[in-house]
Amino acid sequence: LDRINATQVLQYNGAFQQIVGLPQFPDATTLRRFLRRLRPRHIRQLVRLHDQLRQALFARPRPRSSLVFDLDSVVLVLYGHAEGARVGYNPKKRGRRSYHPLLCFEAHRQEFWHGSLRPGNTVAATGAVPFLRVCLAKVPPGIARSRIRVRGDSGFFGKRVVEFLDEERAGYTLVAKEHKPIKALARGCRFQKLR
């Protein structure tokens, strides 16, 4: 909820206010209080609203023909006993409870696409395939799977994720840890220039 402060820029964006039908955009403190009071079913409704708004604005100012998804997982340190928080990998605050959400952003417009809140004791690839399935389900019908690229760090590199993206015919760039078999395969690859 600390990142709500980034919405302050919308207070001065008359076009956005007109699109959503607000006389003025609420203050960050008001938004934070509102979001803290939401129950899970309200959060699901808010996600659906976000997806509908994205669909309505997707082709503006011109239709897109491709998408690039950036996957990320981040450790959110918590203080207190928040529901679902667990002690897990936490390089800055060892032993603290945290969340480890999965996030997907569309790179061209730096647009939030989908997110999933997970306990802190999960690794990056945990639940990545179902997460990607939801991300791809939100792609408008006019964009071919071959025009979708997925990028992720080494936490997402694994057999299940690679096989899923191959089956979906989506392109991908996943960082792989430098193990000897991977190095040997990389040396044997031919360079192919892409358009």
Report the location of each language-model feature.
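Short, conserved catalytic/metal-binding motifs centered on acidic residues
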Residues: 4-7, 27, 31, 65-76, ...
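An internal, acidic/charged active-site-proximal segment
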Residues: 117-195
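Alpha-helix initiation and N-capping motif
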Residues: 4, 13, 28-31, 39-46, ...
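Gly-rich Lys/Arg/Thr-decorated short loops/hinges at beta-loop-alpha junctions or inter-strand turns
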Residues: 108-120
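Active-site-proximal, Lys/Arg-enriched surface segment
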Residues: 30-103
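A short alpha->loop->secondary-structure connector
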Residues: 24
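DNA-recognition alpha helix
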Residues: 3-19
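Structural signal for hydrophobic packing residues in well-ordered secondary-structure cores
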Residues: 11-15, 35, 39, 136-143, ...
